[in-house]
């Protein structure tokens, strides 16, 4: 491919999935992007994306499982070199035959670049985690806005999704690409009559939000949100005056409420890697402890993370002798 505009478009499409340009996005992930967005089209769950989580919960509970909300795990319990359970913030201990961490590897294992408090201490962190840290680094987080707007500002024929970038050279820059989604265009039940929901976000690194006093943080939060809204006026003239509800999320918001180091979207290669092969599968070097999510094969993105969960369930089933076949270790 020689056409510069087409190459930039491919970079942008890959960036939407992996927050990396095409030359650092594994082919399998890039294939999912173009298949989903151009060949098969996209789908929204009726009732909002939260319906996916609700259905998963219903399935787990129907099979005898239990979910405890607002119960923070502080440690993985390790005895005789193997994981045997978890300790909660209130001191309660829960034990099981197999333990699964859906936290990032920086939040799960101690080591260089890890979160201040990890689930597994340095004395039990496998050596392979040091190698992983040399290959991957955390991507940036996001500045996100959830807006409730008067429907009169939305022109007829407005699309559900938009990407806004004024300068191709700024694609990977702080607050470069603006992602816009208006799901109430497809599912009017998501918003009151005469209103629309607008979700917009742009990449933002934690280093720009550190060391701020409460007043300075509030000021930057509002300033950056206003600047983002100003940019959106190119798509929706009059947007600012049509906003009736506004909720702002920053990298600090994502760190606090999602439990992710630096609010990171996930791992990206520190250097160019040979595809997905260096990305570990679900087993870890600590017996009976598994990892799942974007720190495992096949990486970032909803489809990829869902696959890692599917793979992990089969891996554990095989290790427990519950299914006759398994995916790679």
Model-derived features: positions:
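Mid-domain catalytic core of redox enzymes
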Residues: 74-192
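Flexible, glycine/charged-enriched surface loops at secondary-structure junctions
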Residues: 66, 70, 238-247, 323-327
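Active-site-proximal substrate-binding core of FAD-dependent oxidoreductases
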Residues: 78, 317-329
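Conserved redox-cofactor binding core of oxidoreductases
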Residues: 1-53
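A conserved FAD-binding loop/helix module that cradles the flavin
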Residues: 294-317
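Helical element adjacent to the flavin cofactor pocket in flavoenzyme catalytic cores
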Residues: 33-89
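A glycine-rich dinucleotide-binding beta-alpha-beta segment and adjacent secondary-structure elements
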Residues: 7-18, 175, 179, 238-298
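C-terminal segments that line or cap access tunnels to active or ligand-binding sites in enzymes
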Residues: 150-255
């Amino acid at each position: 491919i020689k056409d510069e505009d087409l190459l930039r478009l491919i970079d942008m499409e890959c960036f939407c999935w992996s927050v990396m340009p095409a030359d650092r996005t594994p082919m399998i992930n890039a294939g999912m992007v173009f298949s989903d967005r151009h060949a098969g089209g996209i789908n929204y769950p009726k009732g909002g994306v939260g319906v996916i989580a609700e259905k998963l919960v219903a399935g787990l509970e129907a099979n005898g499982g239990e979910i405890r909300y607002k119960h923070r795990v502080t440690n993985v319990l390790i005895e005789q070199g193997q994981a045997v359970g978890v300790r909660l913030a209130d001191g309660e201990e829960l034990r099981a035959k197999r333990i699964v961490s859906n936290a990032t590897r920086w939040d799960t294992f101690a080591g260089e670049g890890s979160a201040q408090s990890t689930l597994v201490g340095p004395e039990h962190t496998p050596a392979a985690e040091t190698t992983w840290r040399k290959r991957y680094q955390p991507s940036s987080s996001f500045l996100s806005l959830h807006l409730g707007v008067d429907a009169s500002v939305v022109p007829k024929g407005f699309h559900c999704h938009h990407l806004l970038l004024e300068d191709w050279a700024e694609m990977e820059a702080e607050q470069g690409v603006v992602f816009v989604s208006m799901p109430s265009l497809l599912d009017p039940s998501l918003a009151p009559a005469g209103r629309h929901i607008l979700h917009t976000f742009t990449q933002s690194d934690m280093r720009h939000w550190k060391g701020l006093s409460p007043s300075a943080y509030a000021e930057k939060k509002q300033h950056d949100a206003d600047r983002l809204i100003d940019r959106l006026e190119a798509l929706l003239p009059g947007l600012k005056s049509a906003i009736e509800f506004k909720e702002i999320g920053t990298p600090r918001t994502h760190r606090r409420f999602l439990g992710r180091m630096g609010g990171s979207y996930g791992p990206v290669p520190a250097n160019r890697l040979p595809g997905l092969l260096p990305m570990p599968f679900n087993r870890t070097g600590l017996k009976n402890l598994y990892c799942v999510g974007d720190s495992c094969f096949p990486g970032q993105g909803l489809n990829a993370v869902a696959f890692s969960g599917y793979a992990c369930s089969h891996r554990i089933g095989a290790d427990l002798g519950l299914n006759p076949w398994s995916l790679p270790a």
